[in-house]
Amino acid sequence: TSAPASLRDRLRRFLPPVPAPAPAPVSKDERARLDRLIAERTASHALARPDLTRGDALFTTHCASCHQVNGRGSLLGPQLDGIGARGVARLSEDILDPNRNVDAHFYLTTLKLRDGTTTAGFIRDESRATLLLVDTAGREHRLEKDKIAGRDTLAMSLMPATFENLLTKEQFDDLLGWLLSQRTQ
């Protein structure tokens, strides 16, 4: 048998959060289309001659607001030092299908506070009494859990899944080439 709802509600603030549900699965047709796109871009990159200067500029324009490489950019999303070691296929997948492999540290959580306000960000640390939330501007907020009325977590990446349309194939190769050149030294 389970505990009464009133007891569960009182104990909830002392328990770890329930894991967020997995994102809605993409259809078989969409998964197949993305798999073909990733394979196509991976194969075509082998023949490309990426311009690393343009790739660097594309990183600054499209990626640095969330990602950091060698101290440049923001740490809102995953840190990318040594990203080049992932290889062409994995980087193509990460860029073209960002919801395929999302680390739980980068799920967006929206908190409704007891004072009626809401705040959103990424939970970076959580104890029995407090949690540390980093908002989408990169600011840290340590919140007492007893001031939180509710929490919703989106188990998807904030990275747009639009890079296949946002970048030309040449730009994609330039960005991919630059990312591949970023290896730990």
Feature map (PLM): residue ranges:
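Long, low-complexity intrinsically disordered regions
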Residues: T162-Q185
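Post-cleavage N-terminal segment of exported redox proteins
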Residues: T1-P50, T61, V69-R72, W178-Q185
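Periplasmic/extracellular electron-transfer cofactor-ligation site
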Residues: A57-Q79, N101-A104, T117-T119, D125-L132, ...
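Structured surface patches comprising rigid loops and adjacent beta-strands/short helices at the edges
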Residues: G138-L158, T162
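Primarily the internal scaffold of c-type cytochrome electron-transfer domains
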Residues: R41, H45-A46, P50, S74-F106, ...
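Sequence/structural segment immediately N-terminal to covalent heme-attachment motifs in c-type
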Residues: A48-V69, G84-G87, L175
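A short beta-strand micro-motif
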Residues: T109-D115
